[in-house]
Amino acid sequence: MSTGFNAQSFLRMVSSSAGVYRMYDVKGDVIYVGKAKDLKKRLSSYFRKNLGNVKTQALVSHIHHIDVTLTHSETDALLLENDYIKQYMPKYNVLLRDDKSYPYIFLSQHEHPRLAYHRGPQREKGYYFGPYPNGGAVRESLHLMQKLFPIRQCDDLYYKSRTRPCLQYQLSRCSAPCVGKVSNAEYDEQVKLASLFLKGKDKQVISELVAKMEEAAGQQAYEQAARFRDQIMALRRVAEQQEVSGNTGDMDVIGVHYASGIACFHLLFIREGKIFGSRSYYPTVPAQTDIEEVLRSFLLQFYLNADIQRTIPKEVVISHHFEELHELEAAVSEALNKKFSIKTNVRADRASFLRLALTNATNAVMTRLSHKNTVEQRFVLLEEILELNAPIQRMECFDISHTMGESTVASCVVFNREGPHKAEYRRYNIEGITPGDDYAAMKQAISRRFDKIDASGKIPDILFIDGGLGQLRIAQQIVDEKFVNLDKAPQLIGVAKGESRKPGLETLIFGDTETSFSLEDDSPALHLIQHIRDESHRFAITGHRNRRQKTRNTSTLESIPGIGPKRRKALLQHLGGLQEVKGASVAELAKVPGISIEMAQTIHDALRG
């Protein structure tokens, strides 16, 4: 493919300074961002006669023009390169898609502080402990905290509405400060101990509790002493279960495995010498990318991504050495304004952690490769059965979900040769049809999916319809209309359930000829079809349930005379949810801002009647 780019003319004008270059294709999209100590030398290497790397050959064949930006130093070039990669997400760069904020445990500054899961901007006043590697680690820690410290985890609205202790008090997981079952001094002491524990100072917590136990026993307050004893025993069990290292302090330990185009970076987050959590990252790696670039690109983006709430330690241990390691250290140190070091040759505890991280990374890649090979085999078999001339690159499946015509939702799920492509999933809220009319729902969904479709759009090779011949005909009619002026159109296949609706008894129907066929119930190709069908059903039904619940919550209250959107919102926010509103007394309802005693009586009668 020739784009008309004159490399010789361009290279004559390029400086030998440090800087960053952006390569564009004929459409004006940035397809690659790189940095260099010597721009002329680096860019000249792309246009040698014999390019050994297949990826580089493909990249060069798509270059339409190149922009360069000079920098004062190679460190500045690294920082700018990272900014450009985040901005343009070029197709030939290794991309780390880590755009989720990290979760924390939040301790509020309320009179009776609460512990809670938090993700996102830290706007509320209080203390944030973390970040944790994932939501599961936070929930597990909160569950543990409930067993160790009787501190509330309910939200403030629920706390305000209590007139008697909740179930957590009966389970000894909360001291019920909402109804005065504990003094402020005792509650504050437990909050202080919980805070110390979350900071990793469990030995200090235990020693303080031992002192309190002995003091209570000396005062013959044996019941209180027994509670302290039980708390000490629970804390000691937790301390024994946690893997503790001598003097390792805070660091990230990264095991890397790269095979057959799949890279896994498995991180162990070591804080206060303990394994605080772990997380695997799978950056998008263009074909034929070498391990050096994968390593450099991942570390560059991971540790220079200012949009991510993450505490970055001073030390990182990684399983592989790479050429630009020291330049990357300098760039991160400058960006963070603190010392930052990357180590590869380590011993003792660090080596033990590194072996663990590397084992996890290797296992993760092997598992993904096994899954990828299985999916690939299923695609190949399906192509053979359908006698297709070209490989299937994209499949979509539509399903409709509703309850007796209520809150109808259509789903569209997408599979590529690696399996589900969840970023491309779509839901359609169906409006303006006769309730329960699945044909009209399918017509609306397919019409919206392919509205204004053109040759450059995302056209599926196969479009599955979860339904019988009637829905398939409607879908085929819409596709014929939308693709009448295009060279390519999807092959439609209906997936009709058998009489007993058991998996393996499905009938498959071609949309264009309406001929039907079946596959053996142990056919891998059928398993692929069942997978995409089941995924579309799951995605549709979860969307329908969410929409139905939202509609019912709204309609239940707004059907009461005098209750509009504002009062409904005030009731739900103040009391904590629809069930709490239904269970509230007239007096409790009247405490809600904007609700008079007469209105409270009306609401109470309507919901109880």
Swiss-Prot record:
Ranges where the UVR domain occurs: 203-238
GO molecular function terms noted in the UniProt entry: DNA binding; excinuclease ABC activity
Cell compartments where the protein resides: Cytoplasm
Gene Ontology biological-process annotations: nucleotide-excision repair; SOS response
This protein's record includes keyword DNA repair: yes
Highest taxon in the source lineage: Bacteria
UniProt domain GIY-YIG: residue ranges: 16-94
Record keywords, A-Z: Cytoplasm, DNA damage, DNA excision, DNA repair, Excision nuclease, SOS response
Main location, first listed in the record: cytoplasm
Keyword hit for Glycosyltransferase: no
GO CC terms: cytoplasm; excinuclease repair complex
Pfam families: GIY-YIG (PF01541), HHH_5 (PF14520), UVR (PF02151), UvrC_RNaseH (PF22920), UvrC_RNaseH_dom (PF08459)
PROSITE patterns, alphabetized: GIY_YIG, UVR, UVRC
Protein function: The UvrABC repair system catalyzes the recognition and processing of DNA lesions. UvrC both incises the 5' and 3' sides of the lesion. The N-terminal half is responsible for the 3' incision and the C-terminal half is responsible for the 5' incision.
UniProt similarity note: Belongs to the UvrC family.
Oligomeric form and interacting partners: Interacts with UvrB in an incision complex.
NCBIfam families recorded: uvrC
PANTHER family associated with the record: UVRABC SYSTEM PROTEIN C, UVRC/OXIDOREDUCTASE
Protein name: UvrABC system protein C
